[in-house]
């Protein structure tokens, strides 16, 4: 059983970027979905996975030349080689590691500990050295509470000076003199507001715990961030405070009124988030700086954005007065807000420098990747804060958490057709160019497995999952459903259908819209659409809602705003028809030649006609149950009683009815849809598979099959309808046919597959965690294989089975697996 994973196995906990090697590392937490591990991503599909020595979560992650350093929740300090892609050494120090700092020019990594000491680890000899820095804060303040090291940072221009951030304050340590040079103790006197949200705490002296400590890019100043949301700028020469401020207020270390964030109710206040992360950035000139801050905002606001203080050129320290220095930080040249999605909070960030790694990776950054508390990622241009799409910018696996995926589908597409589908889009410089792709065998004659994934922000991405072979076209396609619908919220996609042969795609939303896209050249490049309402119950032309930066790709074509509940079934055929079913029970058939709606009805109408002629007794309770389409499929075959073949639409419902519609051309070139009949099955219909009666070959409505209708071709076909509890093969529309009932387990998804030259079979995923194959038409079990150890059984209904026996299913919230169940189970 071949397995290929896509995505991130668990919640992301750490991000690290190396601008020299152009690589990005991602660490994850240990969870029920998988162990903590490290992913290293490079250009295109370059990816390696580094497992931790023991089950744990990644807490700290840093690049150091050709090595990757990691500290995990088990207190293991692990050193990985990027060259050999393996673990070099794992060491568990005698004290808990709380901070890590390294430099590519040094052979040592500095480890800050929970007891306040700093240890040195020799990366070449792979062992701890004798050198250690004692708890300097405890030596200076013997009565202080237990202090641990929070941050470590070498002076940007003097490797002999180390800034140690304890949770009680900061210290500059000199390696040359082997002693502490200056202590930075942030003490708020009585009456000083500080960054506190609680007005009662103003009337007592306090020392807010430290969370961050960083150098100015030239080492001229020191900046500390605190739990009470204070930002304090210090003079490293004499240890005095130059400016203490919050995101909104200044001089908060001096007695005064201050401002407090009101709570939800009168007389209450809102707590503020601590300062999670600080980056003191510089342009090409290291004296032209700005401060990027994550955190420090009231907890009751929905959008907790990043804040960037654009300071401009730093005053010359030796010739500037104290007032000039203080006002430089009190009144920045510009205050920028880098927006984040509502209801989220940034807990960590990773800057992407333009060219070099200097100044802790903060010189001339062009982008920032932010980690949210949920484990999702967002990427923004810097310093403008404009969203950057991860499509063809970040690695494919990272897009599954950017943001999370809420629906997945897969469609086989002919190879040459997919090779021609390369979108042209205006895009910034790529910042992942490292690594070298591995060589895989080239399967030229296989249809490509094209995955469609919809994300929480309304973005749909298409990409080739392959067959564990060489990916010739590894680029992703992107569709902005939110822009096509005309709004930014309430854009959850519930169904996607991709017609590869026609280069068309349809997306169905929970809000009840169906949006159709078609490949083409954008005639509205660089233009913003005119806001207008969508027509209810009719088709709306949305050609002008194409993305402004997209020159060629999948463009919006038309939209149906049904407004009758979420889309529950959707099928986009290769021959210009789209069928959509809604939870309210309605069914719509769209002919894209107009485009026009050629059929619109409720499933209850044609189900009633079947009940009138039925001898079965039905209670009033079952009659009143809501019914809606759950499965749709187009086919070309001869109906029972006809002497010609035609295009058919089969509709399966949640109550087990299978209706058939006939699509016939009119004189003007348009088509009409007419109801033919309905058959009642025992359970919810999960799959409809039209096949040739003599061979079992699929009889879908392909372009070749429809073209053959002009020549009078007749297809003797049958329909295999699969329900949760059984399957039935019958001649549409009302022939009873033969039935098979599953013995003990319910079926979640199924389809017709072909194994090499051995013929066709029905392959399904079942509730006991097995994939089973059944012969056609006898419906006898051929074999079974356990897949629950690879895929999540609870999400089997969301899995997709292809005609070649590939199964794409979920492993976790942001990880999928593509497996092929055919083979001999022998390792080569």
Task: Map each language-model feature to its residues.
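Eukaryotic N-terminal targeting leaders
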Residues: 1-2
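Eukaryotic assembly scaffold/adaptor repeat-domain signature, activating on surface loops/turns
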Residues: 9-43, 55-83, 96-131, 138-181, ...
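A phosphate-binding glycine/aspartate-rich beta-alpha loop in the early core of alpha/beta enzymes
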Residues: 51
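Membrane-proximal extracytoplasmic
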Residues: 90-91
